[in-house]
Amino acid sequence: MNAEKSPVNHNVDHKEIAKFEAVASRWWDLEGEFKPLHRINPLRLGYIAERAGGLFGKKVLDVGCGGGILAESMAREGATVTGLDMGFEPLQVAKLHALESGIQVDYVQETVEEHAAKHAGQYDVVTCMEMLEHVPDPQSVVRACAQLVKPGGDVFFSTLNRNGKSWLMAVVGAEYILRMVPKGTHDVKKFIKPAELLGWVDQTSLKERHMTGLHYNPITNSFKLGPGVDVNYMLHTQNK
């Protein structure tokens, strides 16, 4: 069977991977294309650590880890972290930065479905941040994340809602007006309504625990978590 068409490798959009490969060398540039990820990372990390009851000593999987911004920060909290991504260049950048920082993270180039086939039920925490909107079959990713976490373990998702406001904010505003991210980063058709994500979660062993919005204020140039999931949102689930 062709590897690209096998059940564990089907869920790859090579055009999406190419977008991030092209800018991978600037992943850790605090003023570059990934500046927004660096800015929101403390909020994401804080939310994950608080909702999971801390990360120290836990086995954590970061799905769609890219250049390792979140993965490294979770390792700094004392977690044993594995980072998954299908982009070769982002993983090379992640490995080099971890080496330079003296941080231990195990980076692996494979799909989450492939990883789930080999490591089911092995993680205390699974994170999947800003990744679902970049794959052909996001429901398959949700299913695999559920398979990977231990009973009672925590799974976190973050993505973008699909509506007019999110198109204005995340595409028109962020890409074309404020130029916070490169043009073409997002495709509003791939955004995911909270009800859709919760529907996929309900078809797994996961149970919704909490949902919050991630909000950007262009006047103060700051981010915060809070009610309202019209644009960016995060979901905490727990394995039954």
From Swiss-Prot:
Pathway: Cofactor biosynthesis; ubiquinone biosynthesis. InterPro entries: SAM-dependent_MTases_sf (IPR029063), UbiG_MeTrfase (IPR010233). Its EC number is 2.1.1.222, 2.1.1.64. It catalyses: a 3-demethylubiquinol + S-adenosyl-L-methionine = a ubiquinol + S-adenosyl-L-homocysteine + H(+); a 3-(all-trans-polyprenyl)benzene-1,2-diol + S-adenosyl-L-methionine = a 2-methoxy-6-(all-trans-polyprenyl)phenol + S-adenosyl-L-homocysteine + H(+). Keywords: Methyltransferase, S-adenosyl-L-methionine, Transferase, Ubiquinone biosynthesis. O-methyltransferase that catalyzes the 2 O-methylation steps in the ubiquinone biosynthetic pathway. This is Ubiquinone biosynthesis O-methyltransferase. The gene is ubiG.
